[in-house]
């Protein structure tokens, strides 16, 4: 329910119309995570390094949000909406695979991210990540050592009334015989934030509470989650 800790292979399906994703992951966030979810027995200093990575990512996040505020000429609206932001970092392992695949099965299916922006570190140089342009054409994302990919998320698309469009992306089965690792940092507003049109154009979306939207999207991705109004309030 809290989208934290270890997620087994096949637990998530970001494209509900396709077979389950071929990955396992570990999620942690910038708030206090329950101690029993940390892998202390396997990696003793993992929690310290994970929390340091959150601090670095959050600093970069504020710099990027400030740039968006400037572009949109909306003061400090986005920075202010993330003063107590609820961010989740995910370490993803796409195992090497030699067997047969189901029709349309990918390492991770076509999807957009749910929050404001996502910072993505590609950990090793194994191809597969693709992004879709506005014309529907897919393009491979090259590996850049120490580089960060910045994806627009669904909430920023709603905030900007489609001025910025959420990035559709996927990980295809190129080099599926090799393990692939990545680390996305998902940026979400302070829980309780109402996301509404910041532009002067007619509204394309109804205002929505940020965590309500997040929980709704997560419920679609995880076969084991059932969306309820109670879950959105936790």
PLM feature spans:
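Residue-level signal for pocket-adjacent positions within structured domains
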Residues: 1, 21, 33, 37, ...
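Fe(II)/2-oxoglutarate oxygenase catalytic core
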Residues: 1-37, 44-83, 141-144, 175-185, ...
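Active-site-adjacent structural patch at catalytic or cofactor/ligand-binding sites
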Residues: 20, 113-115, 149-150
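Conserved double-stranded beta-helix
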Residues: 25-34, 56-129, 172
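Catalytic core of Fe(II)/2-oxoglutarate
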Residues: 105, 121-211
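Conserved small/polar residues in nucleotide/adenosyl-binding loops
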Residues: 227-233
